[in-house]
Amino acid sequence: MGEFSAESATAIAAAGLSAFLCAAAAVWTVGLVVMDARERRLPDTLTLPVALTAVVACWFEPRGWVGLVWAAAYLIAGRGFGGGDVKLAVSLGVVLAIMGGVEAVLAGMLLASAFTAGFLLLRRAKTAPHGPSMLASAWIVGFASTFLLMV
């Protein structure tokens, strides 16, 4: 007892870093949801640095490149998606691709679309902020991917 190996220290540091990053992502998520719900925009100050970081991460984790499909789909669709949605799709797509591959990215895209469509139908609205749906779907799919990998 009392032995503390380098492996133990590394595991504790990794757990602490993971907890910090998860908390930071949660705070970022709340900020984006509130901003998009109130103002119908996702500001560059909250989306661009994270999107650029996600692209840089792809150089170190090549599985992330497939996540750019989400942003590409929004660029191709054009109408209905703002620049903030595209930048957010870069970040969320890369993270989901790293966590769960192309299946996670597609699940995130489909779930976000379903959430926004449901909001439009229930509210009988013609427009809706899409960022909250994207973020909710990314959290759900991210947790599901993590859980499924542990099983």
Model-based region annotation:
Residues 1-151:
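A membrane-topology feature that recognizes alpha-helical transmembrane segments
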